[in-house]
Amino acid sequence: DAEAIIKKAKGDNDLLVAYLHWGSEYRAKPDESSVAMAEWLIDQGIDVVIGGHPHWSQGASTYKGKPILWSLGNFIFDQDWSEETRYGLAASFELVENEVRAIELYPIRIDVSQPRLLEGEAKRLRLEELAKRSDADLADGVRSGRILVK
């Protein structure tokens, strides 16, 4: 079962990341089942939860001090019929003693199935939108493109 697999993986590894294909499509916030699953995974020992599938970038949260990126959105995709589906997010994680201390956010825009990093005002506006979708205590970090994890 999943609980036993996570427990074994936790014993064999310094950091566990769960990357899930989950959630309801075309929504700015995670659905209740995604929230419940993320919390359950962290309760079992997962250190970082990252989601995908909704085709929209969703915000960031923490649960018991562990980071959750609800959905990175699209990266290389051809859903150009919707403005929101033409955005995605890449992230990097700064580790200190096997714990996530910071997350760098790299918003992208997809043009003809090609991801391109946003810069300047476009980047600022996208991070502002993601901040609105994030937990209030993380909003300033999301706006800056660097979330500090406590």
What are these regions (language model features)?
Residues D1-K150:
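Acidic, metal/ion-coordinating pockets
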